Amino acid sequence: MKQLFATTSRGFEELLKVELTELGAQEAKVVQGGVHYQADDETLYRTLLWSRLASRILFPLIETKIYSDLDLYAAVSGFNWLAQFDERVTFFVDFNGTNQEIRHTQFGAMRVKDGIVDYFERQGKTRPDVDKIQPDVRIHAYLNRENLVISLDLSGEALHLRGYREDAGQAPLRETLAAAIVMRSGWQVGSPLVDPMCGSGTLLIEAAQMEAKIAPQLYRLHWGFDFWKAHNQSAWEKVKNEAIELAEEKQREIQPHFYGFDLDHRVLKKAQKNAQNAGVSHLIKWQQADVAALKNPRLNEVGTVICNPPYGERLGTTPALIALYSVFGQRLKKEFCGWNVSVFSSESTLLDCLRMRASRQFKAKNGPLDCVQKNYQVSERKSDAITDEKELEFNRTSEVAPDFANRLQKNIKKISKWAKQQELDAYRLYDADLPEYNLAVDRYADYIVVQEYAAPKNIDENKARQRLLDAVTATLQVTGVETNKLILKVRQKQKGTNQYEKLANKGEYFYVNEYGTQLWVNLTDYLDTGLFLDHRLTRKMIGELAKGKDFLNLFAYTGSATVHAALGGAKSTTTVDMSNTYLNWAEQNLILNDIEGKQHKLIQADCLQWLEKCDRQFDLIFADPPTFSNSKRMEESWDVQRDHVKLMRNLKRVLSNNGTIVFSNNKRGFKMNLVALEELGLSAIEISHKTLPLDFERNKQIHNCWMIQHI
């Protein structure tokens, strides 16, 4: 009996132990990353040929402790390698693990290589050559602290390489992982298996080979034991011939009941070719189809739907994925009553979009990604969520967030008509109208932006996440916007200047119309878009007040108020902001509206410091400071409630005798210190209600706005 070690992906060890035991392995013992077992020659070859889960099967040669690279070299060079293979072979060393003495795997591999070739030289033999591409012999070294194990890799190439895959598409599953997913799915051999997003077909091919009793390595041409002196050719031929006979016998018995669907016809061609190479092309039916129109191909039977849909690291964007998973869940409940469903994904929250309760779940790794496989049992009662294909887009909302969907539909009907009359491209459709859906929905021309407000601490995070996913799904369905034109943002409570933090670097700008102006927006790169929609009427008012006046825009952001003032006939404009990014944006807004000339100044500065040093006066001032800021570029922190009187003192100094200050901020519960302003010689009238547009009338505390003049 030989002592062997089969490696596998973490999480599959127990599954592998069962498989090896069924293949005849003795004394199977699970450890992290694999299974130790004993086998005679026939069982050894059987596990190599038949294991669907093992990554490699190793025959340990040296097990020792080392405390330096010299110990490593001595252990290797002192071993009788001629008993394993002769000097004419090529070899390669895989080295895994490090410790204080062997800090790099390449160094460890080099010392093992040196020990082997030096051993052969001492025996009077020629040095065997190293081959990194296709060596005759592969040596596997594993170092854990001071414990060293050096093995002969009897697999050769890793066992997940079955030999049937020519081209995998964009996001392939390893064959060993696919086999484990099938084994854990609850699928029963002989029953239908459907993959509605099959990609290159790996899940179906692995399952079909299981049913057809095709050994996963039946078509492998090269093995790690080909040049091994202990190789038992007769035992190997017996095991392989048995596998060939079993596959041929089983082929005559099986009827096709594997079905693969995918939207991409190109990847389906790859799947068909892979299935042909795997010897199961006659068992699988392939069809180009959208999951949104998924049909059950075996209505009178019960089987399993298995799927590895796109997730964060694979294809697609978040809104598109939310919509995909949501409609997938609906089709399952309509078409596959009583069936088992098994879905593998790295995004557990996306699986929540299926709106199904998992009966079992398993953790696994897909490369570096932590993934989960969830199994479901579809109710035997047919879902009435979708009754007709033509009604698909409309009836979905009856299942997903119906209250939110109805409110959004109602708002769209009212606000869109108004916006068209006002010649507006950018406006708010929904603003936390329903407490359980704490988010905003804005339209920017052909785009929709969904902004999630941070949930209160007493709201369960998972529940809030589920509601967001439902709301995104409903928004896509109600608005009819394409998934690539829905932008999803998570908005936390603002701290300091983090509203200016960059989220992405796509650089995708387009302009929207607002009361005859054109303004650039960017929906993806920042938390905000470059245009505060709630201040639309404030900007319009500034344009109406600006004719013939010197205008100052303080805390200017992207300068949209400056554009209105300039087009309203301002004699001059001065735009001040601390951010160079937003000043450049403001400049582009001016250029877009054909506003040019030396009378339009853009100044990058700390607004408070600049104001203290300013020596000219203005007839119209717009100041819209942040609620709070502690930017490193500011000498002091800023709090609008605490510091607004100081700001007014400085603004009064630069305000002409008949001038007007339009002051606004977004602090909820802001209290203007009217007594202090009167002492400064200023009067303030709140005009918040006049600056609140129709699309924000549901949120009367979105901002407060004041008209301030000399007494």
Swiss-Prot record:
<keyword id="KW-0698">rRNA processing</keyword>
<dbReference type="GO" id="GO:0003723">
    <property type="term" value="F:RNA binding"/>
</dbReference>
<keyword id="KW-0949">S-adenosyl-L-methionine</keyword>
<keyword id="KW-0808">Transferase</keyword>
<keyword id="KW-0489">Methyltransferase</keyword>
<dbReference type="InterPro" id="IPR029063">
    <property type="entry name" value="SAM-dependent_MTases_sf"/>
</dbReference>
<dbReference type="Pfam" id="PF10672">
    <property type="entry name" value="Methyltrans_SAM"/>
</dbReference>
<protein>
    <recommendedName>
        <fullName>Ribosomal RNA large subunit methyltransferase K/L</fullName>
        <ecNumber>2.1.1.173</ecNumber>
        <ecNumber>2.1.1.264</ecNumber>
    </recommendedName>
</protein>
<dbReference type="GO" id="GO:0070043">
    <property type="term" value="F:rRNA (guanine-N7-)-methyltransferase activity"/>
</dbReference>
<dbReference type="InterPro" id="IPR017244">
    <property type="entry name" value="23SrRNA_methyltr_KL"/>
</dbReference>
<dbReference type="InterPro" id="IPR000241">
    <property type="entry name" value="RlmKL-like_Mtase"/>
</dbReference>
<dbReference type="InterPro" id="IPR004114">
    <property type="entry name" value="THUMP_dom"/>
</dbReference>
<dbReference type="GO" id="GO:0008990">
    <property type="term" value="F:rRNA (guanine-N2-)-methyltransferase activity"/>
</dbReference>
<dbReference type="InterPro" id="IPR054170">
    <property type="entry name" value="RlmL_1st"/>
</dbReference>
<feature type="domain" description="THUMP">
    <location>
        <begin position="43"/>
        <end position="154"/>
    </location>
</feature>
<dbReference type="InterPro" id="IPR053943">
    <property type="entry name" value="RlmKL-like_Mtase_CS"/>
</dbReference>
<comment type="similarity">
    <text>Belongs to the methyltransferase superfamily. RlmKL family.</text>
</comment>
<dbReference type="InterPro" id="IPR002052">
    <property type="entry name" value="DNA_methylase_N6_adenine_CS"/>
</dbReference>
<keyword id="KW-0963">Cytoplasm</keyword>
<dbReference type="Pfam" id="PF22020">
    <property type="entry name" value="RlmL_1st"/>
</dbReference>
<dbReference type="GO" id="GO:0052915">
    <property type="term" value="F:23S rRNA (guanine(2445)-N(2))-methyltransferase activity"/>
</dbReference>
<dbReference type="Pfam" id="PF01170">
    <property type="entry name" value="UPF0020"/>
</dbReference>
<dbReference type="GO" id="GO:0005737">
    <property type="term" value="C:cytoplasm"/>
</dbReference>
<keyword id="KW-0694">RNA-binding</keyword>
<dbReference type="InterPro" id="IPR019614">
    <property type="entry name" value="SAM-dep_methyl-trfase"/>
</dbReference>
<comment type="function">
    <text>Specifically methylates the guanine in position 2445 (m2G2445) and the guanine in position 2069 (m7G2069) of 23S rRNA.</text>
</comment>
<dbReference type="Pfam" id="PF02926">
    <property type="entry name" value="THUMP"/>
</dbReference>
